[in-house]
Design a protein with these regions (language model features):
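ATP-binding/phosphotransfer module of carbohydrate and carboxylate kinases, centering on a glycine-rich
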Residues: 1-77, 93-95, 144-149, 193-390
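Anionic group-transfer/hydrolysis microenvironments
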Residues: 23, 30, 105, 138, ...
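A short glycine/serine-rich beta->alpha loop
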Residues: 51-53, 107, 174-182, 332-337
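Short beta-strand-loop/turn "lid" adjacent to the catalytic site in phosphate-handling enzymes
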Residues: 70-125, 130-132, 142-145, 231
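A general secondary-structure junction signal
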Residues: 104, 135-137, 309, 339
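Phosphate-binding/catalytic loop of phosphoryl-transfer enzymes
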Residues: 108-206, 361, 372-379, 384-390
Length: 390
């Protein structure tokens, strides 16, 4: 495997950068320039990257990424020709890619092959010498708030909170629907179905409104176990009922209570990872996170908490109680909508890497930059909430 030679400290504003978002719905790739905001063009590969006993399949990712990258470079060359009124016999060369950042679901736990194989393969195929390999939570963070200190709650089928003071990462939840993801889509959907089944049985805590929605979506309540338990995508099936809970919340106190509980879990995760404001100390003193409690806020100014992901498209039935719970746990916190998605975040990381201005904390599994280490070296800071690896 080729290891890329040392790259110059920074690339010029016209150099290309690539951002990649690999998730359950496939691979998304964006081409941009160092000196421009936003992508020049994007493309989608609908097939998810395979995961096997050895982790995420690096070869399968490359089989999709390399043609996509060349397609985007060809588009850029054609666009440049149209803008200048000239014609070229070739395309933009792969050597013009100054940096590439990949954010992948499962990178932290299943990304060893990617970290071992991709840097050399990308150097050989695309001539790129600056590569960042990130967990999808990190690209979600970069997409939501950029390189500022703060916290991001990424909610979808699951739920994870990630925060940083630009020195280390802090993680809360994201442990899957059996061990956590409290307040996420699957959690809300399961709680809603539980309330529906309670109404079906005549037990306390039931909701007739949610039982009606269960029947409309899945059919007879007594047949639901046979539909749900054989499925390999049970979290997604549970999460599909979460919008029904939100739709009932305005008139049904049980549904509203489920969303308020979810909001409490979401706010607790955000409070666990949100760095204290500059000049203040958390409960451990000296600005530390102490034992995980919410940081003190003696200045009256809280940190930034961004909400991102499809979960929050349920709107005010969920977002309003989340704001209320955050105001209680993090007084003065600024709750914001994400300014971009994980693909935006991957492109932002690539731009910062190309410009020599990547300020987000390095970590061997969360944000690994191989050009900053020798072959086989995994350096970086620890993630609170996750054992250090590498």
């Amino acid at each position: 495997m080729t290891h890329p030679p040392a790259a110059p400290a920074s690339a010029g504003p016209g150099a290309f950068v690539l951002g990649v978002d690999s998730g359950g719905s496939g691979l998304r790739v964006a081409l941009g320039r160092v000196g421009l905001t936003g992508p020049l063009s994007t493309t989608v590969c609908a097939e998810p990257v395979r995961t096997g006993p050895g982790g995420i399949d690096a070869g399968h990712l490359l089989d999709q990424l390399l043609p996509a990258a060349r397609e985007l470079l060809e588009r850029a060359a054609a666009s440049d020709d149209a803008a200048t009124g000239t014609a070229t016999t070739g395309t933009a060369t792969t050597g013009e890619i100054a940096a590439l950042a990949i954010g992948a679901a499962g990178m932290a736990t299943l990304g060893e092959r990617l970290r071992a194989e991709l840097p050399g393969a990308l150097a050989d195929a695309l001539g790129v010498r600056r590569v960042a390999l990130a967990a999808d939570a990190v690209t979600a963070y970069a997409g939501a708030v950029g390189q500022r200190p703060g916290a991001v709650v990424a909610g979808g089928t699951g739920m994870i909170a990630l925060g940083t003071d630009l020195k280390e990462w802090h993680r809360a939840d994201g442990w899957g629907h059996l061990l956590g993801d409290s307040g996420g889509g699957a959690w809300i959907g399961r709680a809603g179905l539980d309330a529906a089944m309670r109404a079906h049985d005549g037990r306390r805590g039931g909701s007739a409104a949610l039982l009606d929605r269960l029947r409309a979506v899945f059919g007879p309540a007594e047949e639901l176990p046979g539909l749900l338990y054989p499925r390999s995508d049970r979290p997604a099936v549970l999460a599909s009922f979460a919008p029904e809970v939100a739709a009932c919340a305005g008139a049904d106190p049980v549904a509203a209570g489920i969303l308020r509980q979810a909001a409490g879990h979401i706010a607790e995760a955000a409070a666990a990872v949100c760095p204290p404001p500059a000049g203040t100390a958390g409960p451990g003193g000296e600005g530390s996170k102490g034992d995980g409690a919410a940081p003190s806020d003696e200045s009256g100014e809280g940190g930034e908490v961004a909400l991102t992901g499809g979960l929050f498209r349920m709107g005010e039935p969920l977002v309003a109680p989340v704001r209320e719970e955050l105001a209680r746990l993090l007084p003065g916190a600024r709750v914001t909508a994400a300014t971009g998605d994980p693909l935006t975040g991957a492109l932002r990381i690539a731009r910062a890497l190309a410009a020599g201005d990547l300020r987000l904390p390095r970590h061997p599994t969360m944000l690994f930059v191989p050009s900053e280490h020798g072959p086989g070296e995994h350096g970086g800071t620890a993630v609170r909430g996750e054992p250090r690896t590498g």
